[in-house]
């Protein structure tokens, strides 16, 4: 788990040049101050985490349990509640604001997000299969996955077989990304 974390929104992408005149692709994030709503500890909750919110939301547009949760903590209601699993939460208090400067000091970050959904994809796109021959008798099977299992024994396809299906729209993490600039 992490020592520090923060929630942000992807705005877009751009590029910058480094000292050797190499182009670096850069993802631009909007990171609003995150307000701590609840501190979850190992002793009380069984795991350590921070529950944070960001942005603003009218209390009239919330359910009563949500509004009560914010009222009990004394924190202004935000757009979403997000839980950040951390190793040590002793240094955090309810109502504390987390800003991007705390994360930017480290220089490197791990980014977790939901990947782009690509819908139902074939085996070649989804798993990088090579496909079948383009000629020499191949008939309408050029992008097919090929054989998927054995014959009478075991009379089934083993679990985990790479086949066509939904691609993307899954939680994914990229490790050790460089922080280029934070303001």
Regions of interest found by a model, annotated:
Residues 1-183:
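Extended basic (Lys/Arg/His-rich) segments that typically form rRNA-contacting surfaces
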């Amino acid at each position: 788990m992490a020592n520090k974390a923060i929630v942000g929104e992807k705005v877009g992408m751009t590029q910058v040049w480094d000292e050797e005149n190499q182009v670096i692709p850069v993802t631009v994030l909007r990171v609003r101050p995150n307000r701590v709503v609840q501190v979850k500890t190992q002793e009380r909750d069984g795991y350590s985490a921070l529950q944070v919110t960001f942005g603003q939301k009218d209390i009239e547009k919330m359910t009563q349990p949500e509004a009560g949760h914010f009222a009990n903590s004394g924190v202004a209601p935000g757009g979403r509640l997000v839980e950040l699993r951390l190793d040590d939460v002793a240094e955090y208090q309810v109502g504390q604001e987390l800003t991007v400067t705390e994360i930017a000091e480290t220089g490197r970050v791990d980014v977790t997000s939901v990947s782009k959904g690509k819908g139902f994809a074939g085996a070649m796109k989804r798993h990088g299969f090579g496909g079948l021959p383009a000629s020499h008798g191949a008939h309408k099977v050029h992008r097919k996955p090929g054989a998927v299992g054995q014959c009478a024994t075991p009379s089934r396809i083993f679990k985990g077989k790479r086949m066509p299906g939904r691609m993307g729209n899954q939680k994914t993490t990229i490790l050790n990304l460089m922080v280029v600039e934070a303001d």
